[in-house]
């Protein structure tokens, strides 16, 4: 019973909470117990808010019983990457020198979660200061991949992907500047979603600390969940006035066939290419028009902010003139081993960075597993000899999250790759 609840989707658990068949108090206790049991191995959380979460759960239970239901996230346990300021709770960015940094105000997205009634369990670990893609460098220790700790979890939102994959919480709010949410989602076999630039507020990411203005133009809030519909639910709760789940085109809104561009970069490894090819066959079966497409893999130097703004307008006018969604692998290789990842940028963001540069919505969904020999598995489960997840990335027009999420959800429903790792973590 407990395992079923830990891996339930937000839509399911939210309905159970609203109907008072599951209490937020019991659910939070289950999650905290699981964190206490598994976090010593995973190191997914830097800070766990036992007392605060239980108090919030009691308030949520009282409100829901009294008919004051706030929506689909009310009473749902979530976590936030330790990049976002949380009033009265330390925010470290995985940087040991920030271990006593306690903000006085919530980041906008944290405040939005609170308004939605979500229960904050704690702050997730990350590659320190967001400056790496492996998840191995943090002032609070490396995060471990819940599928196999001999392999990296990806970064910089490493703790979030590990926490969601291990059933410690139902969703996390993250950041994504070069793929920081999508890369670890692909490594850990979960969903990583980055909305369009400007659709979710970034205010309150280490507020008051020095930051590179060009990097801020690339930084997007991200959402990690176990399913596409869950990502859409969280997005609806935290998006600002620019973020919408209304389709941007008449074709997408009506449900008629849309054009999906297939863009596999030449740098993909053989294992990734095999899984990608199988995924594309599934995409064809969805009934939409599939064509070849050139994705903007070559990102210009981004020192001039005026250049970024102009390029974003160009891609909106030209790159998506012929297609509605572009599909490509999330990673260029299979998940790297820890011993091969001494460089903090060992996991290449070559397939993810351009979505940040151009401000486009993008999502990574599971599309298969490698076998212990590195062979992509076409079946519905990881191989018995240590399969690692492989991610499929979909990218859409700016501010057309609705079409992107609809296509990703249809693919997910047609494949249903497992998102429950074989805990305790195997190591080989």
Segments (PLM) and residue ranges:
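An N-terminal boundary/leader segment
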Residues: 1-54, 284-288, 420-428
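Short glycine/serine-rich loop/turn segments
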Residues: 73-221, 263, 330-343, 372, ...
